[in-house]
C-alpha cells in the first residue's frame, strides 16, 4: 500500500520521531523494502544487469550488524498480486514507469531498475545465514503489522502505511536506520535509529483520536483508493489554514486534513461528515469503499506468522485468508509458497492467470529479453494450470505444434489454458496471452502429486524443457548443472544469437563465481590457493566501473539480459519441480560489470584460456563447461527433428536431415561429450598443490 505524500511529510518533521538505540529485541523486517533499499543505496550496478556477488555481501553485512546488537530479525516477503485487482492499475503504472527508467539507464541517464535475480539472491542469503523468513500469499504489509503487533516489537520498512498502523513497538523507517554505523558503548552495541509511534504523532494534532488515522489514509489516497475519490473530497472540503513551521517541509493538504479530523472524537462521526461533504447518489457505494479501506488497517490480536516462526511451518491454513484459487491447492504447494521455496510468479498464475514480467536494462528497439525464456514459462504455466491427469502415450501424436506442443490426445483431454503476460514492447507495457503447455514427454503429471513423482521423471521434464541430453553433464559438478543447461538453452533460444565472445564471457563468469565460492570455504583446497586468488584478482581488474553510465554496449546488455531471463525462469521451473537439480547459488552466477568487461576483452582478441593462465583448476573448469556446451551443440544439431532423450543410435539420421548448415557448425565447434571427457582426463590430476609448488 502506501499513503501518497505522507513519507516526505513525516520524515521532514523531526518532532514526530524519538531517537532509538536498537539492541536486544525482535525486529520484524519488510523483506522487499529491505532488498530494494540495500541494493539502491550501496552504489551497486543497475545498468549492466547487476552485481549479485557484491549484493550478497551487503546483505550479509546487514544481518551481521543486527547480530552484533543481539537483534533477532524475522523477515516477511510479499507474495502475489491482490486477487481483487484493486491495485492492478497502480502496478501497471509502475511497470510502465520502469520501462522508461530502464530505457533511460540504457542511454546513460538516470533511473532505478532492480536487477532480475536480486530477490533470489536475497532469499538464498537468508537461508545460508539461518535468518527466519516467510512469504505471504499477497502483499505483506498487513501480516508484518499483525506480527509486530502481537510481539510488541518494532517494524523495519519503508512503507508509509506504517505511519497509520498502531504498533506499540513502533515503526523504524529505513531512511534513519544506521545499520552500517553500529555504536559500541561498554559491552553493548546498538544501531542508531528513529522510532515513529502513532501516539506521538497524534499528540501534535490536538491529541486526535488515533483511530481516525485509517480514515485519513483512505481519503488522502493510498494504492487502493480511486484518485477521483480523493480529488472529489479535497475539492469540496474547507480545511483550516495551518501556519508553516520554519525548517519543516510544507504539506498544506496533509496538515490541514489532520487538523480537520482532530475535531472529531471518533471515526464514525468523521466518516459521516466525509460522506455528507461528498454527497450525491454515490453515498452508499462510497461508504462501502471507505469502510473497506479503513478495515485494511484494523489489526487482529494474533498473527498466523507468529505460529509459522514458532513452529517453522504452518500446521493449518486459514482458508478465509487464502485467495479462492488457492483453497483447493495441495498442501505441499502452500507450504513451499510460505517457506519462500516458490516465487510470487506461481501465486500470480494460480490466482489471476497473470504474469507481470520484470523489466531489464536492454536494447529497447529489440523485442523484450523475456522472449528468450518463453518456452520455459509455458511449461511452468502448464504444470500449474493443466492439472487433469492425461492418460496418453507421451511419444505419439505430435503433429502441427512443433517440439513444445501437447500431444494430440492430451489436447483433446484438456481445454486450452492461457496466461496474461505483461511485458515491454518498445517503450510500452503490452499485454499478450500465452498458452500453457504440459511437458511433451510427461503430460500425465498433476500438480497435486508433483512432489511425489520420481526425481528421475522430474529431471527429465526439466531437461526436456531446456532441450538438454543428460549424459553430457557427466563431467560437470552437480551444483553447476542448472546454469550449464540454461546457458545451452539461451544459446539456442535467443535472437540475435549470442556470439562466441558472449558465450565465453558467461562461462568465465561462472568460473569466477565458482572460484570465489570455493575460496570462501574454509578447508577447501582453493581456500588458501595463491594462484587462484591471483586469477580472481586479475579478472576483477577487468570489471567495468559501475558508476560509468555512458558507453554501455546495448548488444551485450540485451544478450546478457536474455541469459538472466532464461536463468530466472529455469530457477523457477526447478523450484516448481521440487529441485530435481541442486539449486545454484545465484550470487555467484552473474556479475554484470565483470561480464561486460570480459566480453570487451575477448572481443578485442584475447583468448579466454589466457585469462585463467597459472590456475589449472580454473582452466580445467572452464574447459569442462565449454566442452559440455559444445556437446549440447553437437547433440542439438543431431536431434533437431528428434524428440529429446531418444537413443543415441539415431543421431546420424538427424545429422543427415540437418544438411550443410549443421556440417558447418560441426566443423566450427568440435568436441561434444568426448571432448569434455578428454579435457577432464587431461586436467584431472591437477590440484592446487601443483600450483603451490610453482609459486
Listing of model-derived features with the role each one plays in the protein:
Residues 1-68, 73-105, 121-127, 180-695:
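Charged, low-complexity intrinsically disordered segments
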Residues 14, 59-62, 110, 140-143, ...:
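Eukaryotic intrinsically disordered and solvent-exposed regulatory patches
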Residues 77-79, 132-143:
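Acidic carboxylate-rich catalytic motifs and surrounding loops in phosphoryl-/glycosyl-chemistry enzymes
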Residues 111-129:
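Two-metal-ion acidic nuclease core segments, chiefly of the RNase H-like superfamily
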